[in-house]
């Protein structure tokens, strides 16, 4: 017999050890620890206790059979002994309590019958007494009425006496009340007698138990739960079963579904109180396959919930953002601030050179390729006040960077070369300025060149709704030369005049607020962000929040690298201390609590991730049917690292636009800073090319590149990287086969040759006819045969080529149906490399 401990028994019955010990103590067992042994008898005792505590009555045996064995030995002849076993069996039958119960029932019936007879006798006497009283009262009233009628004189004149008024209804109800009570008593007595009679004739519990188990009734049928009647003497006793009853709703239940900007399928199903499988099935019917953890955007979830008949409540999940906005108070006296001026225009029109002359520096010569690839932010002290300049790139790839420049600025200086006129990026800069509602000052540059034509610039800009002041418009035109310095003072005066009209003000005493112009990852200092302070004052040590990033300002530097303690409105600074490089264009805000900044940053990260996933999935679903049945595109994978965030965005946008329906570019990884070992591993895993834009690879990355033979390329001009990617994509396209027609000959006569069959006597009309080249036979300009030129002769001599204007004999391989007037076209197939 195997013995088990209390702990093992608890594992078997799936209950905590403490609870099992408590139940054993209640059962009278002496176990106190989990390591004590439990015998089979103790298990039976515990089981009997648990059954009794849960209302299960253990039925006592009505019949007990005892067996007794005795063995004796008998000696027989031959000194042999025989074992004799005597078995005795005795059965004890317990007397059934039914007879005692029946006797008790008879006594109770006789007692109840006597009580009922007494009640009926008493009720009858009470009814007779009340009837006698009512009869006497009625006779007295009739006598009184007759006496009154005899005294009236009208009776002698034959006037009919007035009828006796009927007793009021209330009195009638009073007289009827005793009779009604008596009837109710008699009815109750009869009901009790009938119930006892039915109870005596009911089957016993044992006979009824199987039928009761077979019948299942719901809560709605008897109102008290599931049960069956039982008990001694047929008494009605209702035993409830611990079973839940559910009543189906008579109509669809309409619920209010709260939907944020994104919601998963499981959360939406839970709010609608339906299974997630039903939601997935419904989405399949709508033509959108989803999974249970799929993130749905707000519009899709709203459409789905409304289709299923529920009310939709759209909520904005910006409670933290609103709370943050309320906590920011910009109190104080507003003061005039310096204007923020953005210099925009087409590439190579002289934007940076113009700023160089104003700042008396040489920035343009230091730019790679002589073009600006970052947003430069500078503030300049002039005789008439301070001006902050933002220099934006002019290349087509930097559209987003120019848009950010227009968004953060007060005035736009549109630089147009007098010798070049309005170009595509010039038009784009005009559109950005108008979209941001920013006034434009046009600087017509390179006015000192001989081929300069400023009037053409005016006409081109006027055609694009930029009207000069002298023509009745509101745009100032200034002729300047960035090299000679002509018109620079007039340009600054025009800018400051425009700033006075705008009445630019800020509150220096308020907490700092600005916009991120640029960001990069410095190897020695970490994430560095170029920030333009727009309002308030930014101080060293402030806790700042920029998009999904936050941190404490550890240091501030101006554009010359000099440290600053604080920066007021319209001052561009570089700040150190953020946890990562923020995106250019993010709004930077000073907050009071670092905990609140971290909470808002994490909330924005989660929100951005969910929205991005929802958009990616919707884009995949939109393209699923378009790409069905098409060959898979060839993809050029690129890992791209750049020095600043703006250049990274510009390159990603420019590279993603390259390609066609056969090849495409996919930037599998991108970031700011040098090329690290993890970037090299990513390129190795994804079979990608490593591109470094103004950055270099560290020692670990170079080691992996050399060992694995990865393709690592460095660039410092955006034109070069785009051209190289175009060449790589063109190589992935492969080559195509083209046909070049070498010559055309017309059949003038047909000869028969025993060796070659039909020989066509031809005149070469165009080009040259070559032997052993593919040909086509055309009749009425319709191709009737394609084959190979087998024999080419001139004056019975085999030749390899016949030029135009000469006669020749042509034998076509496996073709004899040549007729006069046919044309024989000789061609060749060449493979040509394709390009984008």
Swiss-Prot record:
Residues 114-138, 170-210 have a biased composition (Basic and acidic residues). InterPro entries: DNA-bd_dom_put_sf, EF-G-like_DII, EFTu-like_2, IF2_assoc_dom_bac, IF2_II, IF2_N, P-loop_NTPase, Small_GTP-bd. One of its GO terms (molecular function) is guanosine tetraphosphate binding. Its main location: cytoplasm. SUPFAM superfamilies: Initiation factor IF2/eIF5b, domain 3 (SSF52156), P-loop containing nucleoside triphosphate hydrolases (SSF52540), Putative DNA-binding domain (SSF46955), Translation proteins (SSF50447). PROSITE patterns: G_TR_2, IF2. Residues 370-374 are annotated as: G2. Residues 481-483 are annotated as: G5. Residues 229-243 have a biased composition (Basic residues). GO terms for cellular component: cytosol. Residues 114-252 are annotated as: Disordered. Residues 345-352 are annotated as: G1. The keyword Membrane does not apply. Residues 445-448 are annotated as: G4. One of the essential components for the initiation of protein synthesis. Protects formylmethionyl-tRNA from spontaneous hydrolysis and promotes its binding to the 30S ribosomal subunits. Also involved in the hydrolysis of GTP during the formation of the 70S ribosomal complex. This is Translation initiation factor IF-2.
């Amino acid at each position: 017999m195997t013995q088990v401990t209390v702990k093992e028994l608890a594992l078997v019955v799936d209950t905590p050890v403490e609870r099992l010990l408590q139940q054993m103590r209640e059962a009278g067992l002496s176990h106190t620890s989990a390591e004590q042994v439990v015998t089979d008898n103790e298990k039976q005792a515990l089981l009997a206790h648990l059954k009794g505590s849960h209302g299960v009555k253990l039925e006592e045996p009505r019949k007990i059979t005892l067996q007794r064995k005795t063995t004796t030995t008998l000696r027989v002849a031959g000194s042999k002994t025989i074992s004799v076993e005597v078995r005795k069996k005795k059965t004890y039958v317990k007397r059934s309590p039914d007879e005692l119960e029946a006797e008790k029932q008879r006594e109770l019936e006789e007692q109840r019958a006597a009580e009922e007879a007494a009640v009926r006798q008493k009720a009858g006497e009470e009814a007779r007494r009340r009837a006698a009283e009512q009869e006497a009262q009625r006779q007295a009233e009739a006598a009184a009425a007759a006496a009154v009628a005899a005294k009236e004189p009208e009776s002698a004149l034959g006037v009919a006496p007035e009828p006796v008024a009927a007793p009021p209804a209330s009195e009638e109800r009073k007289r009827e009340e005793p009779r009604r009570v008596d009837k109710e008593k008699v009815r109750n007595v009869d009901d009790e007698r009938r119930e006892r009679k039915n109870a005596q004739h009911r089957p016993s519990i044992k006979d009824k138990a199987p039928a009761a188990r077979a019948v299942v009734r719901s809560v709605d049928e008897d109102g008290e739960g599931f049960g069956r009647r039982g008990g001694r003497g047929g008494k009605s006793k209702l035993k409830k079963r611990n079973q839940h009853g559910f009543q189906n709703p008579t109509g669809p239940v309409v619920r209010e579904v709260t939907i944020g900007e994104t919601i998963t399928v499981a959360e939406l199903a839970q709010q609608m109180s339906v299974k997630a499988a039903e939601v997935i099935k419904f989405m399949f019917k709508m033509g959108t396959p989803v999974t249970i953890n799929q993130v749905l955007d707000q519009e899709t979830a709203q459409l789905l919930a409304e289709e299923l008949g529920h009310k939709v409540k759209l909520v904005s999940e910006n409670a933290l953002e609103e709370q943050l906005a309320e906590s920011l108070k910009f109190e104080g006296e507003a003061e005039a601030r310096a204007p923020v001026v953005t210099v925009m225009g087409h590439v190579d029109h002289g934007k940076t050179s113009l700023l160089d002359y104003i700042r008396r520096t040489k920035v343009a010569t230091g730019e790679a390729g002589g073009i600006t690839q970052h947003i430069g932010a500078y503030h300049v002290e002039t005789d008439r006040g301070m001006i902050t300049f933002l220099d934006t790139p002019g290349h087509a790839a930097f559209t987003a960077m120019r848009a950010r420049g227009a968004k953060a600025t007060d005035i736009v200086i549109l630089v147009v070369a007098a010798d070049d006129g309005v170009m595509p990026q010039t038009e784009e800069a005009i559109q950005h300025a108008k979209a941001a509602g920013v006034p434009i000052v046009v600087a017509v540059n390179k006015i000192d060149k001989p081929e300069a034509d400023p009037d053409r610039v005016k006409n081109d800009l006027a055609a694009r709704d930029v009207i000069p002041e002298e023509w009745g418009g509101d745009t100032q035109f200034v002729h300047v030369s960035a090299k000679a310095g002509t018109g620079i003072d007039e340009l600054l005066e025009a800018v400051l005049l425009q700033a006075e009209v705008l009445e630019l003000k800020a509150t220096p005493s308020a907490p700092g607020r600005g916009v991120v112009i640029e960001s990069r990852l410095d190897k020695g200092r970490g994430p560095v962000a170029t920030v333009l302070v727009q309002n308030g004052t930014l101080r060293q040590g402030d806790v700042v929040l920029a998009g999904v990033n936050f941190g404490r300002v550890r240091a501030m530097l101006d554009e010359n690298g000099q440290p600053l303690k604080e920066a007021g409105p319209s001052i561009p600074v570089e700040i150190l201390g953020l946890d990562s490089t923020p995106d250019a264009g993010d709004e930077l805000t000073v907050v009071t609590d670092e905990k609140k900044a971290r909470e808002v940053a994490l909330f924005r990260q989660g929100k951005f991730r969910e929205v991005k996933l929802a958009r990616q999935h919707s884009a995949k679903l939109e393209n699923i049917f378009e790409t069905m049945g098409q060959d898979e595109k060839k993809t050029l994978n690129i890992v791209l690292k750049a020095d600043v965030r703006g250049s990274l965005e510009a390159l990603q946008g420019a590279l993603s636009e390259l390609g066609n329906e056969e090849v495409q570019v996919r930037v599998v990884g991108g970031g700011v800073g040098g090329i690290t070992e993890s970037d090299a591993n990513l390129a190795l895993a994804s079979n990608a090319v490593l591109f470094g834009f103004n950055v270099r690879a560290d020692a670990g990355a170079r080691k992996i590149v050399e060992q694995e033979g990865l393709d690592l390329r460095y660039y410092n001009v955006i034109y070069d990287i785009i051209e190289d990617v175009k060449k790589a994509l063109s190589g992935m396209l492969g080559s195509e086969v083209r046909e070049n027609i070498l010559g055309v000959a017309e059949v003038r006569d047909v000869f028969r040759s025993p060796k070659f069959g039909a020989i066509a006597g031809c005149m070469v009309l165009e080009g040259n006819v070559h032997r052993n080249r593919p040909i086509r036979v055309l009749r009425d300009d319709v191709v009737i045969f394609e084959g190979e030129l087998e024999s080419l002769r001139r004056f019975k001599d085999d030749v390899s080529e016949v030029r135009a204007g000469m006669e020749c004999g042509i034998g076509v391989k496996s073709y004899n149906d040549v007729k006069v007037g046919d044309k024989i076209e000789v061609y060749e197939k060449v493979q040509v490399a394709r390009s984008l």
